[in-house]
Regions:
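Mature N-terminal segment immediately following signal peptide/propeptide cleavage
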Residues: 1
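Structured catalytic cores of large enzymes
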Residues: 4-354
Length: 357
């Protein structure tokens, strides 16, 4: 059966978690995601054709103006994102295709050939309180491993000072345990993890940060633990690295974090080196509605302009480096708004089904 390109639409939330507060804005239906159709010249989706979309992933980042650093948020419930492809929908639905960004005529305030790259490590293994949504990763004890190393692959670092931020939790009764974080010879530590025998706290949380020059093609971080007694325990929540990186297209997909300078009356010009093989560069500041940037080529350097009204994010990529999706099967049409008024909804697991009823 021939599939009409114009009748293809993609839906999904990009994998992001819905807000915890019930009075925060949230979509009433699955959002429509803009896609790019490659090979749609004959109007039919053939074997050699493809559609591309920006899959932002389940974890998210936001810029903190107060700390002048990026902050990440791990999805509390899922490590996978799900999308729904409609192949027999109405034709040419408004907002279903990626459009060109508006040509920027504002004066250029910043010429950018570097950005603040970012990576984080966080795993969810231990729930200290056996309750809630706060989980921790690597565990320290007085008998087990007391040193954990983390390597972050960030090529083309320019040597400027970057940041390593981490958060830990610890439990030591009747003594004091120390935690240390080291990067490029600089150490941050906390020496006040100590609980009294009568304390109602299960553990104490602390944050560690170092500001240190970073160069080369990666950042190595070491977390260590000095237990105060045989019963002392500790856990790593996350380790996050941010370092100034040259804009060099070093892989099939390269993400660019825009200028931190805000100006409604000016633009920034970005310069991406070694990028002659790049097929497209999208503005993904709004992950559900990417925009296709106007590109200029100067040898192996690709340039484009963007407004500085917000902290923008971009992705440069080659078609051949796009990741494939994993098909999950077909889904019958559902009337999600036809359930009528519900007074109470209880979500549970089979083990607790009888109690929930």
């Amino acid at each position: 059966m021939a599939i009409d390109f114009a009748s293809i639409q993609l839906f999904g939330g990009g994998g992001r978690a819905l807000p915890f507060q019930n009075d925060d804005d949230r979509p009433l239906d699955l959002p429509l995601i803009k896609v790019h159709a490659d090979g749609a010249t004959d109007g039919i989706f053939n074997q050699e054709d493809a559609i591309y979309f920006y899959a932002s992933g389940v974890d998210s980042w936001k810029w903190s103006a107060s700390s002048e650093r990026w902050q990440h948020e791990l999805h509390p419930w899922s490590d996978s994102a799900y999308y729904f492809l409609r192949i027999n929908g109405p034709q040419n639905v408004f907002g279903s295709r990626i459009e060109n960004a508006v040509d920027v005529s504002l004066p250029v305030l910043d010429e950018l050939d570097t950005h603040l790259a970012k990576e984080f490590h966080e795993i969810e293994s231990h729930n200290i309180a056996k309750s809630g949504r706060e989980f921790y990763g690597e565990r320290f004890t007085s008998l087990g491993s007391q040193i954990y190393g983390f390597s972050f692959n960030i090529p083309n670092l320019i040597g400027d000072s970057g940041w390593v931020d981490s958060r830990i939790a610890g439990r030591t009764l009747g003594a004091t345990s120390n935690y240390l974080m080291e990067c490029n010879g600089k150490v941050a530590s906390t020496t006040d993890i100590s609980l009294s025998e009568s304390s109602l706290l299960l553990a104490q949380k602390r944050s560690l940060s170092v500001h240190v020059p970073m160069s080369g093609d990666g950042v190595n971080v070491e977390m260590s633990f000095e237990p105060g007694n045989a019963d002392a325990e500790g856990w790593i929540d996350y380790v996050r690295v941010q370092a100034r990186q040259a804009l060099v297209f070093s892989s099939g997909q390269f993400f660019i974090n825009g200028t931190e300078n805000m100006s409604f009356n000016n633009a920034a010009r970005y310069r991406l080196s070694a990028s002659s093989s790049v097929d497209q560069i999208w503005d993904v500041t709004d992950p559900l509605s990417p925009l296709r940037n106007f590109l200029s080529q100067e040898g192996d350097v690709t340039t484009w302009k963007a407004r500085q009204d917000t902290t923008r994010r971009f992705v440069a990529f080659r078609y051949g480096a796009a990741k494939s999706v994993r098909p999950m099967g077909s889904v019958d049409n559902l009337d999600l708004h036809g359930l009528g008024h519900l007074d109470l909804v209880i979500v549970t697991v089979p083990l607790l089904d009888s109690a929930a009823r």
